Structure formats: C-alpha cells, structure tokens
C-alpha cells in the first residue's frame, strides 16, 4: 500500500512540474493574448497566428508585415505556449 501511495504522489508531482501540461488561468495569461487580431498597415500578405481569447484558440489571420500588435505569432506552437500553457 505504501508503494502505491508513493507512486501516485510521484506521478502527480511529475505531472504538475512538466512544462506545457497545465492551462493558464486568465489572470496569469499575458495581456497580449487578449488583444484582437491586427493585420497592420503594410502591403504584404503573410499568414500569422493570433490568440482568440473568446474562443480560447490560436487562429490564423493575414498580416501585412508592418504594424499590428503583439498578439502575432509565426507558429501555432508559439501562440499556444504563450497563451494556453505554462
């Protein structure tokens, strides 16, 4: 019985400490994640990723290559790491 308890505590500890396993609470999420998608004021057409706080998802948008705001990621992974996971 003691071995099972130790194993359970060990597994829980690993899960809590492993990066990318927990969802951030809204108060812990960086404020940039609450900004709307902003395509900017340039003339290019680049696919970028932004965090949609209402849908709690990282979504694609067209970025013009100039201006905009900080809620602008090149990769979905970066958006998720910043706005979804610890």
From Swiss-Prot:
UniProt PTM comment: Contains 2 disulfide bonds instead of 3, as for all Kunitz domain proteins. A double Cys-mutant carrying an additional Cys bridge does not show difference in activity with the natural peptide. However, there are some differences in the kinetics of binding of both peptides to the channel.
Signal peptide: 1-26
Location relative to the cell: Secreted
Location, primary (coarse class): secreted
GO cellular component, one term: extracellular space
Domain BPTI/Kunitz inhibitor: 33-83
Disulfide bonds listed in the record: 33-83, 58-79
GO MF annotations in UniProt: potassium channel regulator activity; serine-type endopeptidase inhibitor activity; toxin activity
Tissues expressing this chain: Expressed by the venom duct.
Modified residues (Threonine amide): 86
Keywords, ordered alphabetically: Amidation, Disulfide bond, Ion channel impairing toxin, Neurotoxin, Potassium channel impairing toxin, Protease inhibitor, Secreted, Serine protease inhibitor, Signal, Toxin, Voltage-gated potassium channel impairing toxin
Biological role stated in the UniProt entry: Blocks specifically voltage-activated potassium channels (Kv) of the Shaker family (IC(50)=1.33 nM).
Protein name as catalogued: Kunitz-type conkunitzin-S1
């Amino acid at each position: 019985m003691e071995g099972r308890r130790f194993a359970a505590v060990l597994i829980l500890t690993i899960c809590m400490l492993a990066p990318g396993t927990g969802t951030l609470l809204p108060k812990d999420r960086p404020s940039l994640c609450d900004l709307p998608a902003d395509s900017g004021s340039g003339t290019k057409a680049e696919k970028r990723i932004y965090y949609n706080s209402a849908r709690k998802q990282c979504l694609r948008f067209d970025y013009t290559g100039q201006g905009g705001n900080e809620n602008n990621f090149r990769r979905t992974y970066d958006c998720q790491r910043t706005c979804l996971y610890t």
